[in-house]
Amino acid sequence: MRIALYPGTFDPITLGHQEIIERGSFLCDRLYIGVAVGHHKKTLFSLSERCELVNGVLADLTLHCPVEVVPYCGLLATLYQKLHANILIRGLRSAGDFEYERQLFYANQHLNAQIETVFLLPAPQYSFISSTLVRELAQLNGALDGLVHDIVKKKLRLNSGGQ
């Protein structure tokens, strides 16, 4: 059985993330979306809010295998092993992402040589979208169309005082 793990902070989940999830679901028999606590980042949404948003978005996606959201804290390599995953899915938008992901790849290999990483490039219309950009636009009351799902947009607007 091919079990994949697509980890991230998803603060918030974007249309780019959604596309990677849909395409990733073709590659496996079961897909886990690992939502990280995000100790290294100050998150806008709590872990439970981020899991709720991911689950809400999943309901509207065309998925080709069962998908489950799993919150996690700690090492990605530990979660990978716990879930019996054999594919780690990561998205690459730019050369900067590649360099960061290359370092993570080697760190994960150091922790667990069994980790196989598959990198997916987003469609061009999603290649510039980041959760950071979305949070900044929301904070400044910028347009979020074409960046996030409507439920995410609504949550961002509520979080920024309904502006």
UniProtKB/Swiss-Prot annotation:
**Residues the record lists as binding ATP:** T9, F10, H17, G91, L92, R93, E101, Y126, S127, F128, I129, S130, S131, T132
EC annotation from Swiss-Prot or TrEMBL: 2.7.7.3
Which Pfam families would you find in this protein's record?
CTP_transf_like
Intracellular or extracellular location(s): Cytoplasm
Q: List the disulfide bonds.
A: none
- Superkingdom of origin organism: Bacteria
Where is the site labelled Transition state stabilizer?
A: H17
Identify a single GO molecular function assigned to this protein: ATP binding
Per its UniProt entry, what is the enzyme's top EC class, as one word?
A: transferase
Which GO CC terms are listed, alphabetically?
Answer: cytoplasm
Q: Which reaction does it catalyse?
A: (R)-4'-phosphopantetheine + ATP + H(+) = 3'-dephospho-CoA + diphosphate
Listed A to Z, the keywords are: ATP-binding, Coenzyme A biosynthesis, Cytoplasm, Magnesium, Nucleotide-binding, Nucleotidyltransferase, Transferase
Q: Does the keyword Nucleotide-binding apply?
A: yes
CDD domains per UniProt: PPAT
Positions annotated to bind substrate: T9, K41, L76, R90
An individual GO BP term: coenzyme A biosynthetic process
Cofactor(s) it depends on: Mg(2+)
Pathway the protein contributes to: Cofactor biosynthesis; coenzyme A biosynthesis; CoA from (R)-pantothenate: step 4/5
Query: Could you tell me what this protein does?
Result: Reversibly transfers an adenylyl group from ATP to 4'-phosphopantetheine, yielding dephospho-CoA (dPCoA) and pyrophosphate.
Q: Which family does it belong to?
A: Belongs to the bacterial CoaD family.
Self-association and partners = Homohexamer.
UniProt protein name: Phosphopantetheine adenylyltransferase
Gene this protein is translated from: coaD
